[in-house]
C-alpha cells in the first residue's frame, strides 16, 4: 500500500512540474486547446509599420496563422505541435488579441480586401486550408464582427445570406473537388461559408490597424459581392467519368492502374463541414477522377 501511495505522489509531483513548464502556466487555457501565449511586446527599434510576422496592406496589418500551438510538456522534452488542426473561432479571436494588443480576427470590408486575403493566403498553402474570419452570429441574432465594426460587406457562397443561428461563424477558403478536363482539380473559393464555431477548428487571419490608421470604408456599389465569372475558351467535347470517393485510400489504389481511372492521382479531399454526417467530418476522404 505504501508503495502505491509513493508512486501516486510521484506522478502528481511530475504532473505539477510539467504544468509549470508550459508557456503561460497558470493562465486560462484557450477553448481550442493549447496554453495561453503572452502578448507580443512592441519593439521600439522596429521601423516597419506592422509588427514582426505581420504584413501591411492599405490601412491594416494582417497575420496568417495555422493556429497550431507549440507546447513543451517538460523542460527536458522537445517542443511539439499541440493543436495541429487549428482553433475554434472564439479561441482564434483570443489568439489574435495575444499576437497584438489591438488585433482581432480579420474584418473584411470590401471585395478588394477579400480578394487580397484570398490571393495572399492561398499562395502560402500547400493544401487547401479553411480559415476563420471575424464574422459570427451575435447574441441578437445578427451577423457581427469581433472587431466591433459594422457589417457593410459580405461575400457568402450562396446568394441568400445564411441565418445567424447561435454558434455559427464564417470561414473562407472552402474547397472541394470539381469536374474539370484535367485530373483532380480542387477549387478553393473566396466566398464565405457558415460553420459551427465551437465544433470546427481552422487556421485564422488576424488584423489590426496601426496607430493613426483606421479601417478603409467600403466603396458603395450595386455590383455583386463575388468575383465575376470568367468564360473558358471552347474545348472539344469529351467524356468525363465521375469522381470516386472513399474514406480508405487502399480501396482506391487498384483503380489508379487501369480502366477509366488509370493514370489518375489520389488526393485527400478537404472536408466541407456543412450538411455532412459527423463521421465524414471526423475521417479523411480521398478521391480520384479520370
UniProtKB/Swiss-Prot annotation:
What is the native source organism of this protein?
Answer: Strongylocentrotus purpuratus (Purple sea urchin)
Establish whether keyword Signal is in the entry: yes
- Pfam families given in the database record: Lectin_C
- Specify whether Glycoprotein is a keyword of the entry: yes
The function of this protein is: Matrix protein of the sea urchin embryo spicule. The function of the matrix proteins is to direct crystal growth in certain orientations and inhibit growth in others.
Cite the source lineage. Eukaryota, Metazoa, Echinodermata, Eleutherozoa, Echinozoa
All copies of domain C-type lectin, residue ranges: 92-162
What's the protein called, per UniProt?
Answer: 30 kDa spicule matrix protein
What SUPFAM superfamilies does the database record attribute to this sequence?
A: C-type lectin-like
Q: Provide this UniProt record's keywords sorted from A to Z.
A: Glycoprotein, Signal
First and last residue of the signal peptide: 1-15
GO cellular component terms, alphabetically, are: external side of plasma membrane
Gene3D superfamilies named among the record's database cross-references: Mannose-Binding Protein A, subunit A (3.10.100.10)
Q: Per UniProt, what is one GO molecular function of this protein?
A: pattern recognition receptor activity
One of its GO biological process terms is:
immune response
Q: In which tissues is it expressed?
A: Accumulates exclusively in mineralized tissues.
Amino acid at each position: 500500500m505504501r508503495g502505491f501511495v509513493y508512486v501516486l505522489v510521484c506522478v502528481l509531483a511530475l504532473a505539477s512540474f510539467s504544468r509549470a513548464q508550459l508557456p503561460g502556466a497558470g493562465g486560462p487555457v484557450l477553448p481550442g486547446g493549447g496554453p495561453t501565449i503572452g502578448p507580443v511586446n512592441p519593439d521600439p527599434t522596429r521601423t516597419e509599420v506592422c509588427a514582426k510576422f505581420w504584413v501591411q496592406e492599405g490601412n491594416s496589418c494582417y497575420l496568417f496563422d495555422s493556429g497550431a500551438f507549440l507546447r513543451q510538456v517538460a523542460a527536458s522534452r522537445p517542443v511539439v505541435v499541440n493543436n495541429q488542426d487549428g482553433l475554434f473561432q472564439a479561441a482564434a479571436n483570443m489568439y489574435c488579441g495575444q499576437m497584438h494588443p489591438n488585433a482581432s480576427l480579420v474584418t473584411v470590408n470590401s471585395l478588394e480586401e477579400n480578394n487580397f486575403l484570398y490571393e495572399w493566403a492561398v499562395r502560402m498553402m500547400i493544401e487547401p486550408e479553411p480559415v476563420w474570419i471575424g464574422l459570427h452570429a451575435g447574441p441578437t441574432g445578427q451577423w457581427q464582427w469581433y472587431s466591433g465594426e459594422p457589417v457593410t460587406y459580405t461575400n457568402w457562397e450562396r446568394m441568400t445570406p445564411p441565418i445567424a443561428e447561435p454558434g455559427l461563424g464564417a470561414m473562407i477558403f472552402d474547397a472541394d473537388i470539381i469536374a474539370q478536363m484535367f485530373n483532380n482539380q480542387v477549387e478553393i473559393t473566396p466566398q464565405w461559408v457558415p460553420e459551427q464555431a465551437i465544433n470546427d477548428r481552422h487556421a485564422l487571419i488576424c488584423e489590426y490597424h496601426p496607430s493613426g490608421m483606421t479601417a478603409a470604408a467600403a466603396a458603395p456599389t450595386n455590383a455583386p459581392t463575388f468575383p465575376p465569372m470568367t468564360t473558358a475558351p471552347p474545348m472539344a467535347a469529351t467524356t468525363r467519368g465521375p469522381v470516386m470517393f472513399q474514406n480508405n485510400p487502399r480501396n482506391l489504389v487498384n483503380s489508379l492502374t487501369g480502366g477509366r481511372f488509370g493514370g489518375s492521382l489520389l488526393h485527400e479531399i478537404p472536408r466541407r463541414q456543412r450538411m455532412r454526417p459527423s463521421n465524414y467530418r471526423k475521417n479523411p476522404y480521398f478521391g480520384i477522377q479520370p
